[in-house]
Amino acid sequence: MYPNLTGLGIHEPKQIERYSLRQEAHKDILKIYFRKQKGELFAKSVKFKYPRQVKSVLVSGGNNQYKEVTEINRNLTLVIDELNKITKPTPTAEVDLKQKILTDLRHLEKVVSSKIAEIEVDLEKLK
């Protein structure tokens, strides 16, 4: 019923609660969150990285100049279509660019802090 999600190793798509999609450099990051199971402290999630497709587009003006643009990976669009059938997301209002940048910055801070803590734990093991 959901061949693209099955291809990602998701065999119980009805357990999917929500998903998020963000762009980092030349990759789209899809994170799928599952319903919290009884006895679990945190809900399980999985992350997938898709490279963005790069295309050369002719710039208008007739001077044979091309510009590289990136767009979402076709496989990712198929996965998102299946996720939307499962999660039935509500349409979101247009996001304020400043707020989006601040949100991305806060996320990056958390990721970096977590990685630093992980490396420090590894260093302590070496002592």
Swiss-Prot record:
Pfam families membership = DUF3461
Q: Which family does it belong to?
A: Belongs to the UPF0325 family.
Q: What is this protein called?
A: UPF0325 protein VS_2356
